C-alpha cells in the first residue's frame, strides 16, 4: 500500500501588523521541534519519495526540515495547499497521483489547518485535528484511503 503523509507546518511566528500571513516563518522553537519531528518520521521508515507543500513560508520551512532529514527528494509547491485550499480538488489530484503508484511509494504534503483536517475527512471519513508539526499517516489500497496513524511531536521527538 502506498503511503501519504499529511503534515501540518511547525510553530509559526504570531500574526503581526505589516506581515502577510503567507510570510510568517517558523519560530526558533518551531525549527527545533520540526527538525526533531521530521527526523522521527524518517526514523520510523517514513521516507518520502516526493513532496508537495504550500508556498507559505512556514510550510516551505517545514518541508525543508523533512527534505533534509530524508536526504532529499523531488519537491513541488502548490497554491492548492494553502489554508483556503479546496479538499475536493486535492482529492482528485491525490487520486491521480496514487492511481498507479508503486506500493512502497511515500508522498508527503505539508500544509495548514483547516485544510488538512478537511482533507483527511474527505479522504477517510474520519475526523482528526492536526496540531502544529503533527502528521496523519494514510495508506492507499485498492482506491481507498485509510487513516492508520496520527503522529504528534511527542511521538516522534527524541
Description of each model-found segment:
Residues 2-81, 85-88, 129-130:
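Active-site-proximal alpha-helix that buttresses catalytic centers in soluble enzyme cores
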Residues 10-11, 57, 81, 113-115, ...:
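Short, flexible active-site-adjacent loop segments at beta-strand->alpha-helix junctions, enriched
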Residues 35-42, 91-99, 120:
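Generic structural signal for well-ordered alpha-helical scaffold segments
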Residues 43, 68, 96-103, 140:
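Secondary-structure boundary motif
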Residues 80, 85-107:
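Internal catalytic or translocation cores that form aromatic/hydrophobic pockets or channels
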Residues 97-133:
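Non-DNA-binding regulatory cores of transcription-related proteins
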Residues 124-157:
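Domain-level recognition of soluble alpha/beta enzyme cores
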Amino acid at each position: 500500500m502506498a503511503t501519504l503523509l499529511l503534515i501540518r507546518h511547525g510553530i509559526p511566528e504570531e500574526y503581526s501588523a505589516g506581515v502577510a500571513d503567507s510570510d510568517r516563518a517558523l519560530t526558533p522553537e518551531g525549527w527545533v521541534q520540526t527538525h526533531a519531528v521530521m527526523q522521527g518520521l524518517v526514523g520510523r521508515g517514513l521516507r518520502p519519495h516526493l513532496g508537495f507543500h504550500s508556498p507559505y513560508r512556514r510550510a516551505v520551512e517545514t518541508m525543508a526540515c523533512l527534505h533534509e532529514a530524508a536526504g532529499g527528494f523531488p519537491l513541488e509547491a502548490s497554491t492548492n495547499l494553502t489554508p483556503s485550499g479546496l479538499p475536493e480538488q486535492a482529492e482528485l489530484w491525490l487520486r491521480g497521483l496514487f492511481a498507479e503508484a508503486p506500493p512502497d511509494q511515500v508522498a508527503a504534503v505539508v500544509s495548514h489547518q483547516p485544510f488538512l483536517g478537511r482533507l483527511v475527512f474527505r479522504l477517510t471519513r474520519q475526523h482528526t485535528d492536526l496540531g502544529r508539526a503533527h502528521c496523519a499517516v494514510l495508506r492507499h489500497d485498492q482506491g481507498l484511503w485509510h487513516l492508520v496513524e496520527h503522529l504528534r511531536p511527542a511521538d516522534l521527538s527524541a
